[in-house]
Amino acid sequence: LFLQLASAHHLLADPGISTEWKVVNTSYFMYFAVLASMIHALSIPGAMEVAQRARGYNKGLFEWLRKAPWGNPTFSGVFIALVGFGFLGGITGVMMGTEQLNLLIHNTIYVPGHFHATVVIGTTLTFMALTYFLIPVLFQREMIAPGLAKIQPYLFGFSMYFFCLVMMGAGTLGVSRRHWDMAFQGAALAYE
């Protein structure tokens, strides 16, 4: 519920939204959305930690993470998706929830970088990991190319991290979205 209320931060630069709604959205609703996101962001890694500690990985704070099944595409896919969704997509979403910063970057390619971090890294990679879990369970067969399955979440996840960071960096430099000519020169290519 709170995440849906705070999603209006995508409308902060639009003229049809009242000032009062913008103030309420960038303050109270955004705080609730961050709270709901943090509950989600801490419960899934916490469940992973509890499962690893139940398997006996109890030495020190991070043995459970060092000894995690990183070769299992289900685990690595979910973990890479959590980091991309939570940190890359989540922190940038909170940043764009402030009206001052939103007005600066709203019509830049920074926003599609944020969307790709949340939807493509977070959601798509999680469903890929779920597929790696369900195929052997449902069909009672091994994966066709297990070596390729082990590296696929890393290749896809880190490539998307790079893609999103480049889009966000370009947006910070002012590269526009929604317009084909970022220099507004009327030239098909800026060097002509």
Regions found by a protein language model. Give the residues of each.
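Hydrophobic cores of alpha-helical transmembrane segments in multi-pass integral membrane proteins
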Residues: L1-D14, N25-R53, P73-E99, P112-F139, ...
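Catalytic cores of extracellular degradative/oxidative enzymes
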Residues: I17-W21
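Membrane-interfacial, low-structure loops and terminal tails that flank and connect transmembrane helices
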Residues: V50-G71
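Flexible, glycine/threonine-enriched loop-and-boundary segments that flank and lead into catalytic domains
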Residues: N102-V111
